Amino acid sequence: MNQGIILLGIKHCGKSTLGNLLSKQFHCPFFDTDDVITEMTGLSPRQIYQEQGPQAFMEAEAKACNYLVRYLSALGEKEYVIATGGGICNNTEALEALASLGFFIFLEVPEAVAAERIIQEIEWEDGKMKNLPAYIAKENPVTTEDVARIFSGFYQQRTKRYRQLAQITCPLQGESPEENCQLIQQALFSQDCRWS
């Protein structure tokens, strides 16, 4: 049975950073589905979503996840850490592929922490906001308060879905990556996982 750790969570919860740290601590490979999408298509997930639409992005994401299944199977890898994109909770095909690779851990950060991280990345150009997640940008926010309000709806919806999908929910408190990595390890230990 594969014992991969698949990290789920809202954008900016730390999936990639924490996935990298976990893979180093467990001496196993790390993969980020967003990076796999970029390698396969030559476009970032955001570019695909904005230029080709949400359906094209979901197809690219599913292809990337199915590729990981084939790749890891061919390598004979049984232990690895995979970080996913924030919207994977709505992509059934991608989730089914990843479920065959291990178990899901939901990295739950407080809404205010994730919203602040998104707001910090905003770039202003000619009085307009740039560098927003596509699901926020399409709502045409004018102020950072608009961004936080739009994000709140997505946060509530996705948090509910992540909880349904995950075998383990790990509440993170916006501490340092190292401290959050320890929280994940404690969650694994409390579930008597092989990784602990």
Enumerate the predicted regions with their spans.
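NTP-dependent small-molecule kinase module
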Residues: 2, 21, 78-79, 144-196
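Hydrophobic anchor at the beta1->P-loop junction of P-loop NTPases
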Residues: 7
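P-loop (Walker A) phosphate-binding loop of NTP-binding proteins
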Residues: 10
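ATP-binding Walker
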Residues: 13
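Walker A/P-loop
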Residues: 16
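Post-Walker A helix-loop "phosphate-sensing" segment adjacent to the P-loop in P-loop NTPases
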Residues: 24-33
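ATP-dependent small-molecule kinase phosphotransfer cores
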Residues: 35-99, 124, 130, 134-140
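A glycine- and Lys/Arg-enriched "phosphate-lid" helix/loop adjacent to the NTP-binding pocket
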Residues: 103-157
